[in-house]
Amino acid sequence: MRRGERRGPAGPLGDGPALGLRRSTESEVYDDGTNTFFWRAHTLTVLFILTCALGYVTLLEETPQDTAYNTKRGIVASILVFLCFGVTQAKDGPFSRPHPAYWRFWLCVSVVYELFLIFILFQTVQDGRQFMKYIDPHLGVPLPERDYGGNCLIYDPGNESDPFHNIWDKLDGFVPAHFFGWYLKTLMIRDWWMCMIISVMFEFLEYSLEHQLPNFSECWWDHWIMDVILCNGLGIYCGMKTLSWLSLKTYKWQGLWNIPTYKGKMKRIVFQFTPYSWVKFEWKPASSLRRWLAVCGIIFVFLLAELNTFYLKFVLWMPPEHYLVLLRLVFFVNVGGVAMREIYDFMDDPKFHKKLGQQAWLVAAITATEFLIVVKYDPYTLTLSLPFYITQCWILGIILVLTWTAWRFFIRDITLRYKEIRRQKQEHKYEKDKCLSNGDGH
């Protein structure tokens, strides 16, 4: 039986002891409890292989007389040794599929990435940008000016050969990226309303900040039709359908070698990449002030992480198509799901989960550090004042949110409490008058 699982009448149940507290939102799991070679940590095996590799480099390989190459290789080797330690020794998170070591690996990558960000934060602006040349010699140069926005006509009568050329120009690689991105984000958040709010809010942020970053300047139909309705909306819809299937699925697991047929074995291998159990997230932001503030905080951090993607490219001089940008997105896809589960557990069962999970803590620290790098490297761009009408819209929105918060969690509660006290007093007075009238009758 693996760590983080609890044995029930039919085998291990769920991913932790909190199952009994969330019986209505977590699926039942049936497992024969088979603990095979695949599930072991293999600490001694990894240590032996690591020692042999280091011994080979030390005793048999001649060290090159290239200081820059040796420095890079030494840093990479140090990171690999840390990853080997973390994958075998770090604490398991809430997920166990496809393998706990997979999620331990991404936890350790989070630590490495945060340390890298801290290093960049403590450099001068020029040194930090030039340091990127050690990762890729093509980096460290200012980005070329690009034309964004432009002609926003859906049908351009001036172009007789292709009047819909503006639409075709927008159908690039970012369209499937938006779709799959929001499909995966929906699997992380597991709530239609939160996904739609984040999607729409980010488009408003692009409108508000296009005077700072030119690539935020898009046509209205690109914002609301291409992004919100088609790409994001379709990704959220498919994500919700997948969530519905996962919540209805029966989680019944059997050891690979206990399955008699080859077809059954292949099916079991494929399903190894599906969740071990499933928890339906019920955020309930209006149920209490604590949950409302927590959900608002989650949305804020989510939007900040999205903005960091664009601002980091801008201040560190990375072109949008660079592989480091893609690697960062892959990183957040893998750590985001774990972080959201840890946050939900922390909110939903604070008596058992007394502290925020390790992956959620690291994701919050990474998001904050990325933003601090943006602030340090280009404060001028960040301090460009918003247009007056944009400022008015945001002030109005903030006032509406604060007003609703005050009404829902303070004024409404006070009013309901006053009505309840008044009702109790009236009932008490009625009972008292009834007793007096009965006494007069006798």
UniProtKB/Swiss-Prot annotation:
Pathway the protein contributes to: Phospholipid metabolism; phosphatidylserine biosynthesis
List of glycosylated residues: N159, N215
InterPro entries for the chain: PSS
Keywords: Endoplasmic reticulum, Glycoprotein, Lipid biosynthesis, Lipid metabolism, Membrane, Phospholipid biosynthesis, Phospholipid metabolism, Transferase, Transmembrane, Transmembrane helix
Keyword NAD on entry: no
Keyword Ion transport: no
Location in or out of the cell: Endoplasmic reticulum membrane
EC number: 2.7.8.29
Residue spans, topological domain Lumenal: 62-74, 126-291, 335-354, 403-442
Entry similarity comment: Belongs to the phosphatidyl serine synthase family.
Annotated PANTHER family: PHOSPHATIDYLINOSITOL SYNTHASE (PTHR15362), PHOSPHATIDYLSERINE SYNTHASE 2 (PTHR15362:SF7)
UniProt function note: Catalyzes a base-exchange reaction in which the polar head group of phosphatidylethanolamine (PE) or phosphatidylcholine (PC) is replaced by L-serine. Catalyzes the conversion of phosphatatidylethanolamine and does not act on phosphatidylcholine. Can utilize both phosphatidylethanolamine (PE) plasmalogen and diacyl PE as substrate and the latter is six times better utilized, indicating the importance of an ester linkage at the sn-1 position.
Name under which the protein is recorded: Phosphatidylserine synthase 2
Organism phylogeny: Eukaryota, Metazoa, Chordata, Craniata, Vertebrata
Gene transcribed to yield this protein: PTDSS1
